[in-house]
Amino acid sequence: DAGEKLLCELGYRLGHTLGEGSFSKVKAATSSKYKGPLAIKVVDRRRAPPAFAYKFLPRELSIVRKIRHPNIVRIFELIEVCNGKLYIVMEAAATDLLQLVQQLGKLPCVPKARDIFAQVVGAVRYLHDRDLVHRDLKCENVLLTADGRRAKLSDFGFSKEANSYPDLSTTFCGSAAYASPEVLMGIPYDAKKYDVWSLGVMLYVMVTGCMPFDDTHIRSMPQRQKKGVLYPEGLPPLPEPCQALIAQLLRFSPASRPSVGQVAKNSWLKG
């Protein structure tokens, strides 16, 4: 098609499909311009729902244009084609955090989980310092290099500009399993504190290999979240500072959760 022809003219070679959604797909690619493997996300605006095409996508594009951080997936180029297709050229990753956790069962708390989590916290702090929020933090949105050492945050489809309280959000974003009580209850929420909660879920998943809260019955999740987090039986005890950090991130009341800047200063994370 016209878009793929244009990509060839621009020096890109498309490979196999890495993933597919209802109105987008991600393909492996290489280029004469950039070193290393690339991924190209192809978005078909004409097949996308209006809320996505006119609200979430423009936000995502305006945000990814202005962020550069070693722990955030780099976007090299945005190519608009008159047939309604958009090509987002970005760095490719070998795997993601969810795949790594599934492969290993769980991650050793120190140094593996701690090192990866510290990098993700650094990326989220970079965003929050610029009044940007992610709103879809989960293990599958943390990409990893082949050696598993460098983490890169991806997928800014629900991100937006958000100043802190009283600028509250109302859109339910992300996955229920990573959603905070206030988001699940439909209460206008401080999106930065929602990101902090999701970080808590992510750290729990990394070190236990399980979800902290069962999301089969979403309506009753906030009651379970209020009781606090439990650990699977038979799991060797986690380091006390790691458990304490998870408990802080998963505090029921958003106001009592730390900011991501405070999390970044956590002595256990700094090793």
Predicted regions located by residue number:
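Activation segment signature within eukaryotic-like protein kinase domains
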Residues: 116-117
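Glycine-rich ATP phosphate-binding loop
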Residues: 25-30, 34-46
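Conserved N-lobe beta3->alphaC-helix segment of eukaryotic protein kinase catalytic domains
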Residues: 43-67
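A short, aromatic-enriched beta-strand patch in the conserved N-lobe beta-sheet
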Residues: 77-79
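Catalytic-loop of the protein kinase fold
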Residues: 128-144
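Conserved short submotifs of the Hanks-type protein kinase catalytic core
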Residues: 83-96
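Protein kinase glycine-rich loop
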Residues: 15-21, 26
